[in-house]
């Protein structure tokens, strides 16, 4: 006999753009998001009995996202995700969990003649600010915030040596190499009791995102990196130290390789070791290094 082991459904790829117009200054601020909302609850019969009476139409979910975006602030995204999730579990008594994922796309205000423009923006990278908000009836609100697609490179200040060498090893040890990666950093907040507690901590979300981004960039640039592993751990340590409300910080960093080209075949042209200036960026394969940094448990007395 079969049963529904797990089920959720909703609306994905809901694109939302909101503009805030300051009536005093005329300055406009824009936010563009891609939103996904998935619901869980007493919905098994829609799968097992073809009973649509328990289904909140995904089109209605889409409409709700637009309406709540009009009625509420959409920044920080941690707050808007909490507003959305709380709405669904309060509105529909048979819905007990709402999962909201928000991707905020980058629009950076243009500077024209040295001054910030009032209403013009540029997408200067594919970097996004992401949140995952899970609202569970009777439990609370779990939030994960993240930076994604933050592409960085440094042309020196990285090394890799002392690793396992055996019959499978061809990689040479290096004391100076190019280091490049696409940063994916995620920090998990301690559980919030409800929407009011989230509202009470609103300033911390933007502050922590800024701090996490700055820590990531500063450590990447200044660290004489012995390995991606060592560098990402130092980043996570600093973010946890900055924000006491965080439980964990997770990094996922692909190691995007740049290989020297031996050009000695052309008239003895030197382009290896200390003479290397021309490299070939590699698309794949690439290294992939992951780490979750948490807090040490306090020993019980």
Swiss-Prot record:
Its main location: other. Pathway: Purine metabolism; urate degradation; (S)-allantoin from urate: step 1/3. Its EC number is 1.7.3.3. The keyword Oxidoreductase applies. GO terms for biological process: purine nucleobase catabolic process; urate catabolic process. PROSITE patterns: URICASE (PS00366). It is found in: Peroxisome. Transmembrane segments: none annotated. It catalyses: urate + O2 + H2O = 5-hydroxyisourate + H2O2. One of its GO terms (molecular function) is urate oxidase activity. The keyword Oxidoreductase applies. It is an enzyme of class 1 (oxidoreductase). InterPro entries: Uricase (IPR002042), Uricase_CS (IPR019842). Gene3D superfamilies: Urate Oxidase (3.10.270.10). The active site is at 11 (charge relay system), 58 (charge relay system), 257 (charge relay system). GO terms for cellular component: extracellular region; peroxisome. A motif (Microbody targeting signal) lies at residues 299-301. Keywords: Oxidoreductase, Peroxisome, Purine metabolism. Urate binds at residues 58-59, 160, 177, 228-229, 255. It comes from the Eukaryota. Catalyzes the oxidation of uric acid to 5-hydroxyisourate, which is further processed to form (S)-allantoin. NCBIfam families: urate_oxi. Belongs to the uricase family. This is Uricase. The lineage of its organism: Eukaryota, Fungi, Dikarya, Ascomycota, Pezizomycotina.
């Amino acid at each position: 006999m079969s049963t529904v082991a797990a089920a959720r459904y909703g609306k994905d790829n809901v694109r939302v753009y909101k503009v805030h117009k300051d009536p005093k200054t005329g300055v406009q601020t824009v936010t563009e998001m891609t939103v996904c909302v998935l619901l869980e609850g007493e919905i098994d019969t829609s799968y097992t009995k073809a009973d649509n009476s328990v289904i909140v139409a995904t089109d209605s979910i889409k409409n709700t996202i637009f309406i709540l975006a009009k009625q509420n602030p959409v920044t920080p995204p941690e707050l808007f995700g909490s507003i959305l999730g709380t709405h669904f579990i309060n509105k529909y008594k048979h819905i007990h969990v709402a999962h909201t994922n928000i991707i905020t796309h980058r629009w950076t205000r243009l500077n024209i003649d040295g001054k910030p423009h009032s209403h013009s923006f540029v997408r200067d990278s594919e970097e996004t600010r992401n949140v995952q908000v899970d609202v569970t009836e009777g439990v609370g609100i779990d939030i994960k915030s993240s930076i994604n697609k933050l592409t960085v490179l440094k042309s020196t200040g990285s090394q890799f040596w002392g690793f396992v060498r055996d019959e499978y090893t061809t990689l040479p040890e290096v004391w100076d190499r190019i280091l490049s990666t696409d940063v994916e950093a995620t920090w998990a907040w301690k559980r919030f009791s409800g929407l009011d507690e989230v509202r009470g901590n609103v300033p911390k979300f933007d502050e922590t995102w800024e701090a996490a981004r700055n820590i990531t960039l500063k450590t990447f640039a200044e660290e004489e990196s012995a390995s991606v592993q060592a560098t990402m751990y130092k980043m996570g340590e600093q973010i946890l130290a900055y924000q006491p409300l965080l439980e964990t910080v997770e990094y996922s960093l692909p190691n995007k390789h740049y290989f020297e080209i031996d050009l000695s075949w052309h008239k003895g042209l030197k382009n290896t070791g200390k003479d290397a200036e021309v490299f070939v960026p590699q698309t794949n394969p690439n290294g992939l290094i992951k780490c979750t940094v948490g807090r040490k448990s306090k020993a019980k007395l």
